Design a protein with these regions (language model features):
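Hydrophobic, small-residue-rich transmembrane alpha-helices and their short perimembrane loops
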Residues: 9-212
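N-terminal secretory/membrane targeting signals
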Residues: 1-11
Length: 212
């Protein structure tokens, strides 16, 4: 194995995922995973509404909204930047899989769609996270005036949990959908496309701007 390892030119894109449609038990198990992930999304939205309904002083709410408007301007600008990055990444993906790997145009488009979904997922979670944080900030500050330490802890704790659960749920839904509905010979490449898009969005939104 060690002597022939240098001759094995393969990577994650060459992984062939089995056809789960022929294995009813495995298919249903993964479908249950998607259902549980949707429950995670619902949990995140419920916590968002609960945090939003917590009372706070109008002046604190105005400050929180002002911070969000500033963050929204940043998000819109970063969205334009991500579009430019995605165009460059799409060219690289199309060249590698279409020219070097000699995949069909249809298969390359599937991989490109996976990368776009990755960027949109990361961008959507960043938007949700910033909005949730600005809502929680004003409520936490107002709650601190009541001198109730547990309530002060619970608001940012629930806000952070909801953001994390929404992030993981979106990633699991997409990954399980790739396993179930994308042909096995394309699944590995789609995972790479999704990972590139997700990482690209995360790095641009977090490193470039430093909002988090």
């Amino acid at each position: 194995v060690f002597l022939t390892g240098c001759c094995a030119f393969a990577g994650e894109a060459d992984l062939v995922v089995p056809d789960f449609s022929t294995h009813t038990q495995s298919f249903n198990l993964l479908l249950c995973g998607i259902g549980i992930s949707f429950l995670g999304l619902i949990y995140g939205l419920v916590e968002f509404v609960r945090v939003k309904n917590i009372k706070a002083h109008p002046l604190m709410l105005n400050v929180g909204n002002l911070i969000f408007e500033t963050c929204k301007t940043y998000l819109i600008q970063q969205g334009k930047f991500l579009i430019a990055l995605e165009v460059l990444i799409a060219v690289c993906i199309a060249f590698y899989f279409g020219f070097l790997q000699e995949m069909s145009v249809k298969n390359v488009l599937v991989i490109l769609v996976a990368s776009v979904i990755g960027i949109l997922g990361s961008y959507g979670v960043a938007w949700f996270g910033i909005r949730m944080n600005t809502l929680a900030n004003a409520r936490t500050s107002f709650t601190a005036l009541r001198n109730k330490p547990i309530n002060i802890l619970n608001i940012p704790l629930k806000a952070g949990m909801s953001i994390g659960v929404v992030l993981v749920s979106i990633e699991l839904i997409v990954m399980l959908a790739i396993l179930l509905f994308v042909p096995g010979h394309l699944a590995g490449a789609c995972f790479i496309g999704f990972a590139i898009g997700e990482s690209l969005g995360a790095s641009a939104l977090r490193v470039a701007g430093g909002i988090f």
